[in-house]
Amino acid sequence: MGDNDQVTTEQRERSGRREQNKAENRAALLKAARTVFAEIGYGAAGVRDIVRRTDLASGTFYNYFKDKDEIFEAVVGELTGELLKRHNNGRAKATTAEAFFHAHYAVYFDFIVDDAELLALGQKNFTAIRTLLDKPDVRALALALNDDIRAAIAAGVLPNVDVSYLAAAMAGIAFEISIVMVARDPVDPAGAAEFATRLMMGGLDRLPRR
């Protein structure tokens, strides 16, 4: 191997280590932020609270995130990515309208309560989360729901109704019921999913067809 080849190899290795270090630092900050937001809430949390939960220098935060708002959005974005995966294995495979609605709500409500930290995050931050509903990561959930409804209509699983209205209704019901659900003790995701499903089924036959 010539000197130039060796230099190139060393440069690649250094670059690879730098990228890995960046990824690890970002992941550490996100993990710490999720914990802090769950414990004290978005309003009370500060950048210093987040950095203290890591081994990173205080200035490192700003290499990855502009401010508290941006890292909060990133935390919620990670969660929506996981929700999308679960919906792909839920409502997207439903063969009846009832199964479609139930899968949609069960995935959402179970996701919130399966993780104690995530449950606390939802309990303390629903107002802040509401402000992110138009952000790209969260909008991806709405787009996926619209796509799944269209596919279900095409497959005869759902009647041919207004897709946008139905998606908005489903998303709104999920979010608003989740706020009430997480405030209760004990939290009952199964009951919440059943209530939302029956509510949708009760109105489905009355919706105008297209």
Regions from the PLM with identified roles:
Residues 1-16, 110, 114, 143-154, ...:
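C-terminal peripheral helix-coil segments that are non-catalytic and often amphipathic
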Residues 1-40, 47-56, 70:
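Basic, helix-initiating cap at the start of DNA-binding domains
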Residues 24-35, 39, 53, 70-90, ...:
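Alpha-helical structural segments
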Residues 54-65:
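Short hydrophobic/aromatic patch on the recognition helix
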Residues 81-84, 130-157, 164-168, 179, ...:
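Amphipathic alpha-helical packing segments from all-alpha helical-bundle domains
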Residues 102, 163-171, 193-197:
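Short, well-structured alpha-helical segments
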Residues 119-123, 131, 161:
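Short, hydrophobic secondary-structure boundary micro-motifs
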